[in-house]
Amino acid sequence: VKAKNKFLLAPLTNMQSPDQGRISDDEFIWLTKRAEGGFGIIMTCAMPVLKSGIGWKGQLGIYDPKHEDGHYRLNERLHNLEALSIAQIFHAGIRADINYSGDKIGPSMNSEKSAREMSIAEIEQMKVAFVECAIRAYQCKYDGIELHAAHGYLIGQFLSKKFNKREDDYGGSFKNRAKFLIDIIEEIKEKTSSNFLIGCLLYTS
């Protein structure tokens, strides 16, 4: 996979798709205009893998089949403009909007954010949600996905010693704290193709 140039539109939060996560005309135009202007790679804003992972109102979604038509349409236009397309996916975790999540969850209990600790079963279900959304992105003709593991969202919460106090296979050592992320990446690799790009946004603090 090769981009036509090094100009990349970063995943910017626009809050332009308030219709239950369906891509709006405003967001469609905003993204495609950048490709019309010559950007070689277009990235979406962070899209939740479950409704419970929504971080703010107006967020573009990819967690439901009803979102697919909009993503097909977006990718058709971007590819006609010779731009690569990347879907950024995430779950807000303890930073989720309570109006959508109803029940905030994270790797460990967080009283400040009124979040409870995820069970092993919930962790497994969450990994499935990430993989299913990556597959949906692949089927909707995105050239790749980026896992958002920064800015204090769920994957980053698992990586962080501050937020991850677990004493099981998902906590403690860095290897254990990274297991959630690594498992997701490996499963996506198995269920897409070698040409499907898999990236990860990380930060060091």
List the predicted regions and their residue ranges:
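Aromatic- and acidic-residue-enriched carbohydrate-binding clefts of CAZyme catalytic domains
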Residues: 50, 62, 97-118, 157-175
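Non-globular sequence segments
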Residues: 76, 80, 84, 90-142
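N-terminal capping/small domains of soluble enzymes
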Residues: 1-90, 126
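Short amphipathic alpha-helices and their capping/turn segments at secondary-structure boundaries
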Residues: 1, 26-37, 72-80, 131-146, ...
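Alpha-helix-loop-beta-strand connector modules within alpha/beta enzyme cores
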Residues: 60-81, 165-196
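Metal-dependent enolase-superfamily TIM-barrel catalytic cores that perform enediolate-based chemistry
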Residues: 116-154, 166-187
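Conserved small/polar residues in nucleotide/adenosyl-binding loops
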Residues: 203-204
